[in-house]
Amino acid sequence: VKFDPQPAAARAAGIFVGVLCGAAAAFGWAAGFVAAKHGISIGFSPADLAFDRFFWTGLLLMPVAFRDGISNPGGIGWWRGLVMSVLAGPPQAMIAYSGFILVPLGHGTTIQPACATLFGLILATVVLRERATAMRVLGGATIIAGLIVFGAESLATIGHSGVGGDLLFVTAGLFWASFGTLLRYFRLSGTRATTVVAVLSVLVYTP
């Protein structure tokens, strides 16, 4: 029987692209955190930063979102779009940015992505019915251990306000994980969903 290497090659290429996209997203996320912390330190409020983050993008993408008509923005509908806008739009952003008022930059850049991953693992098992492999369980346990260390450090060095800041990042991570889970559950295009989030953020949040 002749062995066809194409499936293995295709899987390897897919893994490579996935890792590359993940690394690029992590870099972009980290850069965004640094910019947000700097903005907070020079006097911008979380609401100001959320406005600046979504307003210009929303204006630019508005023709794309409504090219199929105003009744079906981005092809995903109003109610799905509004839910996505809560989970990945200004509410999520303001929760995350508020955390930087209370705790150092390192807490946000670690806790929010870690919680997004942890809650993503949980939601994938509960909502998407994906199998909880031993590696996933081990990874989740490692994340929990790290979060406990961060929480203890906040309580010891910053006090209750530090724990409050950490919990804001935990909440922001939960929102982001829920957004990703719903993308999979509804089989939505990430590009379409992001476009609708930006546009509805302009229409609902900006006024």
Where in the sequence are the language-model features?
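Glycine-/small-residue-enriched transmembrane alpha-helix faces in small-molecule transporters
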Residues: K2-D48, A145, L155-Y185, L203-V204
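Cytoplasmic-side transmembrane-helix entry/capping segments in multi-pass membrane proteins
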Residues: G18-A23, I76-S85, A132-I144, D166, ...
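Helix-helix packing/entry segments at the starts of transmembrane helices
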Residues: A26, F51-D52, A93, H107-C115, ...
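Specific transmembrane alpha-helical segments of multi-pass solute transporters/efflux pumps
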Residues: G28-F33, A65-Q112, L121, V149
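Specific alpha-helical transmembrane segments that line the substrate/conduction pathway
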Residues: D48-L59, A88, Y97-R131, A172
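Hydrophobic transmembrane alpha-helices of multi-pass small-molecule transport proteins
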Residues: L61, M135-S154, A198, V202-Y205
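C-terminal ends of transmembrane helices
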Residues: L61-N72, F119-A132, A177-L188
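Loop-to-transmembrane alpha-helix entry segments
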Residues: T110-P113, R129-V149, G159-D166
